[in-house]
Amino acid sequence: QLPSEADYAKAAKLVRKAGRQLAFATPRIIKEAQLAYFDKLFTLWEEMQPDFVYINNNGLWPLAKKHAALNLVADMSLNIFNSQTLQFWQEQGAAGAVLSPELTMAQVEHLVSVSPLPLECMIQGRLEMMVSEYCVGGSFLGALDKGACKFNCAEPLFLGDRKDARFPIVTDQFCRMHILNAHELSMTANVQHMAEAGV
């Protein structure tokens, strides 16, 4: 289910009340028919004056740039591995960039030393392994084949493998199924090192 204007306003109010930075993010898969929706959504976000908007799809960048008040960040799914990519996103007007989680600490340090942009890294969380239009929850538990899904997307759902690993399944606002890694990425031991490096 797509968030309403009231949902976004409520979230923004809670964030501001907590004294935190407000940031919105886009999905990494955008269909042609969804471009108009995001164009309107950027207008709404601009009115809310977020600190940053994280862009995960190349096609959304030109739409977002039309809204000059938005500080756009090239997010992790844009595969930022090298200095040329950072230079490209600076030329596109990015306010910052999120590095690929596949980089080594030495590679991160090098990019920080040559980057024209402020950089971020993912520190804690599960990486996405797969995304699909096919929804396991809706198909098996929500009677999706009857025409209207009754599955509660907030209900915890997992896939298991032969080693008994549990892969969390989450559903986005467009009913896409996202399968996450069974193990969390954790760089908490390197937080101080990263901060000293300038991330």
Label for each model-derived stretch:
Residues 1-88, 92-199:
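Active-site pocket-lining/capping segments in soluble small-molecule metabolic enzymes
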